[in-house]
């Protein structure tokens, strides 16, 4: 699967770009009003008690700000943060090395925490609850257990698959926060802020247009802005105007709903090759040359969310809205223009 403009996951070359755009404190963070309000209370209370913040579980779709919030938590608590991914902690010894290097009150951020191995997870339980580790040294008859006391710390876990977490791990988080898709008005504000960080002027109409096509996801909004800025600079315009924005999005093949060429290809297949469905996922995968799991996990959730696609016991089916949007009549014609 090629990197898509509307892919919610981070592209390989985007890490430093996203880092430069991140707000550092809650007052700078746009959107997720309920989460912000709750975190303000929890953080203030923890600081009044002079205790670390309770362990925090952040979950929701990719690109909504889980990593940003973890860094904000550390900044608000005025402590250091250590960042690691679940798959990178392969053995209990890896976890012990990370935890023993923390200072009192520090934040340990584990991204993709649902991918921790069961062996590592078992070692993590007492560390979260009672701040100690039991590590087995040696093998066979010479094996012995060593207890390592740990400084109090805050674990912030992030996952796009909260349902994949085991019950015991999930229950050890005192704070559960679900990140929701952003409103278009919030995305517009994010786009304007990002443009300021990039020293680029943008008219409000362009910010609204980009927000509308960003699938409720700041990562996509910032990515689209970055590409539209390329067109603006090549045109030698003094700012990003709506005409340039619309032309750029047309060339990038991102339509009014934030659907791209792959979404159009998939819906064209269902509507025109299979008369709108129902059609099985494996059949769709073969027809468009994609893996079944990629369609199920990456492509179809947004199409279902927007009401273009329906899951039925017999397979996937295009909705009346899909026919209307894709300009397909009776499953026989398409005119996929952006």
UniProtKB/Swiss-Prot annotation:
Pfam families to which the protein is assigned, alphabetical: AAA_lid_4, RuvB_C, RuvB_N
InterPro entries the record matches: AAA+_ATPase, AAA_lid_4, DNA_helicase_Holl-junc_RuvB, P-loop_NTPase, RuvB-like_N, RuvB_C, WH-like_DNA-bd_sf, WH_DNA-bd_sf
Location of region: Small ATPAse domain (RuvB-S): 183-253
Catalytic reaction(s) noted: ATP + H2O = ADP + phosphate + H(+)
MF GO annotations: ATP binding; ATP hydrolysis activity; four-way junction DNA binding; four-way junction helicase activity
Binding site for DNA: 292, 311, 316
Region (Head domain (RuvB-H)): 256-338
HAMAP family in the record: DNA_HJ_migration_RuvB (MF_00016)
Designated name of the protein: Holliday junction branch migration complex subunit RuvB
Organism: Staphylococcus carnosus (strain TM300)
UniProt lineage: Bacteria, Bacillati, Bacillota, Bacilli, Bacillales
Gene name as annotated: ruvB
């Amino acid at each position: 699967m090629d990197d898509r403009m509307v892919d919610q996951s981070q592209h390989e070359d985007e890490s430093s770009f996203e880092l430069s755009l991140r707000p550092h404190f809650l007052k700078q963070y746009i959107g997720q009003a309920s989460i912000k309000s709750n975190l303000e209370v929890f953080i203030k209370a923890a600081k009044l008690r002079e205790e670390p913040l309770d362990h925090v579980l952040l979950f929701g779709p990719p690109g909504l700000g889980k990593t940003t919030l973890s860094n904000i938590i550390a900044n608000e608590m005025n402590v250091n943060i250590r960042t690691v991914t679940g798959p990178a902690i392969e053995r209990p010894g890896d976890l012990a090395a990370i935890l023993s290097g923390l200072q009192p009150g520090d934040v340990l951020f584990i991204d993709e925490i649902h991918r921790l191995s069961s062996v590592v997870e078992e070692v993590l339980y007492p560390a979260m609850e009672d701040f100690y580790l039991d590590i087995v040294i040696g093998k066979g008859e010479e094996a012995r257990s060593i207890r390592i006391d740990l400084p109090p710390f805050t674990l912030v876990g992030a996952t796009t698959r909260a349902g994949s977490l085991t019950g015991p791990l999930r229950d050890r988080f005192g704070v559960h926060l679900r990140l929701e898709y952003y409103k278009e008005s919030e995305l517009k504000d994010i786009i304007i802020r990002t443009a300021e960080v990039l020293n680029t002027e943008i008219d409000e109409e362009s910010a609204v247009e980009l927000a509308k096509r960003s699938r409720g996801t700041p990562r996509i909004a910032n990515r689209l802005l970055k590409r539209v800025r390329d067109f603006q600079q090549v045109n030698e315009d003094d700012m990003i105007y709506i005409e340039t924005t619309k032309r750029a999005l047309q060339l990038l093949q991102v339509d009014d709903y934030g659907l791209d060429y792959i979404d159009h290809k998939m819906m064209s297949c269902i509507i025109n090759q299979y008369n709108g469905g129902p059609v099985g996922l494996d059949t769709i995968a073969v027809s468009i040359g994609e893996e079944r799991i990629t369609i199920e996990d990456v492509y179809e959730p947004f199409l279902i969310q927007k009401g273009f696609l329906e899951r039925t016991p017999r397979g996937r089916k295009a909705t009346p809205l899909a026919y209307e949007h894709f300009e397909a009549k009776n499953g026989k014609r398409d005119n996929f223009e952006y």
